[in-house]
Swiss-Prot record:
This is Motility gene repressor MogR. The keyword Repressor applies. Keywords: Cytoplasm, DNA-binding, Repressor, Transcription, Transcription regulation, Virulence. InterPro entries: MogR_DNA-bd, MogR_DNA-bd_sf. Its main location: cytoplasm. It holds the Pfam family MogR_DNAbind. It comes from the Bacteria. One of its GO terms (cellular component) is cytoplasm. It is found in: Cytoplasm. One of its GO terms (molecular function) is DNA binding.
Length: 306
């Protein structure tokens, strides 16, 4: 079954859920039967989608649900699994299914294609269970117990002992606890002190040079990273724009394919009709033909230039 048939079925299911009527299930079963899909499967998706939308309303509507602390509802995951299964059975690719179900196309789920695809694979690999899944909360920082006895610290944040012990080597003079690096002022003060200590010792010029060279290299890397991050963000934005454009072109292609198919059928019906039927049907045929040609972008004003 072509991708367009699966899309039409899911589109009809969403339409019936958005505008329920007494014959909703009947219409869905009829379309499923004509498309060669199990009617029970189509009806199950209809009921799952109905329950999902009801659950969203219970959370205050789609906007509040999208900004709530819930990442996925249990019924939403059941619907996700059912939609992927029905499409995969008809040889659709996971990437195309994700695009079709997402906010970019049918909008069955208030999710992006990547969110749908990642969650489907997690369900398939049983990395997550079919249950309500909350959004990840940022970790809380643990409170550190303050020392009741105030102790003196040096510029590196290291506690100065009561009995001062003179350092025996240059290494001892510049060593400090990295875990106590607090802010930019502490770091710059530490660098300044290290340079002064190294400069006071004869024969340590090379060490000072190496230290400053290392600082320069690290700062250069930081600048390069900043530029790369910006380029990466620009590429991401461009990629999203291309994805949207690609989705639009796919939809346009499907529409033109359907219109071309209609045009062929109209011409064939007229060509193979009897002479009498052709004479009687000519006015209606001409009108239908013009409408279909317009859908394909062919108009009276431009057809000679094509």
């Amino acid at each position: 079954m072509p991708k367009s048939e699966i899309r039409k079925l899911l589109q009809e299911i969403k339409k019936q859920v958005d505008n329920p009527g007494n014959s909703s299930t009947t219409e869905i079963k009829k379309m499923a039967s004509e498309a060669g899909i199990d009617e029970k499967t189509a009806e199950e998706i209809y009921h799952l989608l109905t329950e999902f939308y009801q659950a969203v309303e219970e959370h205050g509507g789609i906007e509040k649900y999208m900004h709530s602390n819930i990442s996925w509802l249990k019924i939403e995951l059941e619907l996700l699994s059912a939609c992927y299964q029905i499409a995969i059975l008809e040889d659709m690719k996971v990437l195309d299914i994700s695009e079709m179900l997402s906010l970019n196309d049918l909008r069955i789920f208030p999710k992006t294609p990547s969110q749908l695809q990642n969650t489907y694979y997690k369900l398939k690999k049983e990395l997550i269970q079919v249950e309500d899944i909350p959004k990840n909360k940022p970790g809380r920082k643990r409170k550190t117990q303050k020392n009741t006895k105030k102790e003196k610290t040096n510029i590196f944040g290291k506690v100065v002992p009561a009995e001062f012990k003179a350092p025996t080597s240059i290494k001892e003079q510049i060593s400090y606890d990295k875990s106590r690096e607090k802010n930019l002022v502490d770091l710059l003060s530490g660098v300044k002190s290290n340079v002064q200590l190294l400069s006071e010792n004869q024969g340590e010029e090379n060490n000072v040079y190496d230290l400053l060279k290392s600082i320069y290299s690290l700062s250069s890397l930081a600048v390069q990273k900043e530029e790369l991050d910006k380029k990466y963000q620009d590429l991401q934005t461009k990629c999203q724009e291309l994805e949207q454009e690609n989705s639009y072109l796919k939809q346009q292609n499907e529409t033109m394919t359907d219109s071309f198919h209609t045009l062929v059928l109209q011409v064939a019906d007229f060509a193979y009709a009897s002479d009498l039927d052709q004479i009687q049907a000519l006015p209606l045929f001409s009108q239908q033909l013009v409408v279909t040609l317009n859908q394909l972008g062919v108009f009276k004003e431009n057809y000679k230039q094509m």
